[in-house]
Amino acid sequence: MNKYHNKKTVNGSIAFDSQKEAQRYTELSLLEKAGVITKLELQKPFELIPKQKGERAVKYIADFYYFDNEKNCFVAEDVKGMKTQVYIVKRKLFKYRYPDILFMEV
């Protein structure tokens, strides 16, 4: 367990940070097999602020990223337990920088 009481879990050959995230992967995999979603990716990075001289880029890593065929748009999903201040700022930057991608917290 980590400081947020999440238990790392393995689903198939994939390690997840929490049981909730592993369960969501199972759900999304079934939706992908049914054709409801396509192009499912795990841990997809998005650049929020480019690197600058002497500074690294700021990135947000979505737990899941896929195309929702019913909503006709790309979706970035974050499986959340504890919402830290850093997460809240990155979520706001993501929504500003990528307005065409639907952001969902599960």
Which residue ranges define each predicted feature?
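Electrostatic, structured charged patches in enzyme active sites and in nucleic-acid/phosphate-binding
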Residues: 1-106
